[in-house]
């Protein structure tokens, strides 16, 4: 399953079955014009290190403070449970799990479910929700440390577009490899030049940003079906 996210209004367009699994995620309030005025090459370089400055530093370098709040993922994981019929015997991998907030809320909703998370950021993994520490690890989406067909569901939200195009393709293949059946991938995309300009103005970490149609072609070229 592939979703393309139009950054300015958080609209999700599904390329396969019509389903929006992020419908309950709060819509962001972003001052794109202000970011465009002050965004610098240095800001981008700092953000792409995915360290403390990106998560918990100045807003110009990333989140400007990345802490747990149940309003974000708690409503969303309920839809995950219903859509994939998740239960205590299910398994799920979050690729780009950051501090494990989504995994934490899911663990509360579906106790004893097998949960795993990987993230390229040592800082994020070191500062993960305490309850999730034993379930997450530093890892690369291009070469995941898991066996084939290891998880019932693999999720990658706003993750693979942070890679160069070739590496993005590798990550897609890895997602397909470790997934038994289901995967859910969300990427930034634009529909027109206005959205494209806004997306490039706001985005700090994205290296592969394409239009909706270009993403469709890319996923088809890489045999990704979700």
Where are the regions that the model predicts?
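A conserved beta-strand element that flanks and buttresses the S-adenosyl-L-methionine
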Residues: 155
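Conserved acidic residues
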Residues: 152, 181
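Hydrophobic adenine-recognition pocket in adenosine-nucleotide-binding enzymes
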Residues: 159
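Class I (Rossmann-like) S-adenosyl-L-methionine-dependent methyltransferase catalytic domain
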Residues: 4-84, 91-145, 163-170, 174, ...
């Amino acid at each position: 399953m592939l979703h393309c996210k139009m950054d300015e209004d958080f609209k999700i367009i599904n390329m396969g079955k019509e389903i929006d699994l992020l419908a309950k995620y709060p819509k962001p309030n972003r001052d794109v014009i202000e970011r465009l005025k002050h965004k610098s090459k240095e800001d981008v370089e700092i953000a792409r290190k995915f360290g403390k400055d990106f998560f918990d530093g100045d807003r110009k370098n990333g989140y400007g403070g990345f802490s747990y709040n149940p309003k974000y993922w708690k409503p969303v994981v309920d839809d995950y449970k219903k859509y994939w019929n998740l239960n205590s015997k299910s398994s799920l991998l979050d690729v780009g799990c950051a501090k494990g907030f989504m995994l934490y809320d899911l663990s509360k909703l579906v106790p004893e479910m097998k949960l795993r998370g990987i993230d390229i950021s040592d800082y994020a993994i070191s500062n993960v929700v305490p309850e999730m520490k034993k379930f997450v690890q530093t890892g690369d989406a291009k070469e995941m440390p898991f066996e084939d067909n290891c998880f019932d569901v693999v999720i990658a939200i706003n993750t693979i577009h942070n890679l160069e195009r070739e590496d993005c393709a590798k990550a897609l293949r890895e997602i397909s490899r470790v997934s038994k059946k289901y995967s859910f991938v969300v990427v930034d995309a634009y529909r027109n030049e206005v959205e494209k300009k806004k997306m490039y103005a706001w985005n700090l970490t994205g290296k592969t940003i394409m239009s909706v149609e270009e993403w469709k072609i890319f996923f088809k070229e890489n045999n990704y079906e979700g």
